[in-house]
């Protein structure tokens, strides 16, 4: 696919089929993320892919737990594919995606958030190229800054000084 066609085709998708993506496709998507431009060429991003549906759902619920959606009353994202802002009955910020990639970056690095979102966008473009749906989700740090979320960071061996910056939903 030509680059500009790819960019035009990439959309945020919030509806997913009930099937897991292929491991080979996931590896290509992660590699695309790790090749993203970043400040100083430091390649500091850490990506954790979650393919367990129950865990994706749990983390998705943590993702919106501290988010005051009522403060955005009147905001509008999409009637075709409602977001958590459009539909308060949505209980997971991950919309049932079968695979969720958490993108981590250094907590005290000025360009950490920008670097993470460059990584995430490369991943979303790669997913589009492979014919997969994707959506970028913010509120990374808040997702794990709580009693149920913090143990996952230890389980995934995320270094001290790193925080989740964003998520890439894939399906």
Where are these regions (language model features)?
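Short beta-strand segments
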Residues: 31, 36-37, 43-46
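Solvent-exposed alpha-helices and their adjacent loops that cap or buttress functional pockets
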Residues: 39-42, 92-95, 156-162
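Specificity-determining recognition surfaces
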Residues: 1-27, 43, 165-171
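Glycine/small-residue-rich phosphate/adenosyl-binding loop
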Residues: 42-116
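Small-aliphatic-rich amphipathic alpha-helix that forms the alpha element of a beta-alpha
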Residues: 29, 33, 101, 106-152
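A glycine-rich helix N-cap at a beta->alpha junction
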Residues: 67-73, 80, 152-171
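Residue-level "edge-of-site" marker
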Residues: 46, 140, 166
């Amino acid at each position: 696919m030509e680059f500009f066609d790819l960019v035009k085709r990439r959309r945020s998708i919030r509806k997913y089929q009930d099937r897991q993506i292929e491991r080979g496709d996931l590896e290509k998507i992660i590699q695309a993320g790790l090749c993203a431009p970043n400040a100083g060429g430091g390649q500091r991003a850490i990506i954790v892919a979650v393919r367990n549906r129950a865990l994706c759902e749990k983390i998705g619920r943590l993702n919106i737990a501290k988010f005051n959606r009522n403060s955005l009353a009147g905001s509008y994202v999409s009637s075709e594919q409602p977001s958590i802002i459009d539909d308060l009955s949505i209980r997971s910020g991950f919309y049932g995606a079968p695979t969720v990639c958490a993108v981590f970056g250094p907590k005290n690095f000025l360009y950490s958030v920008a670097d993470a979102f460059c990584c995430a966008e490369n991943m979303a473009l790669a997913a589009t190229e492979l014919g997969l749906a994707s959506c970028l989700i913010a509120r990374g740090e808040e997702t794990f800054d709580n009693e149920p979320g913090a143990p996952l960071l230890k389980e995934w061996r995320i270094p001290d000084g790193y925080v989740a910056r964003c998520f890439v939903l894939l399906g």
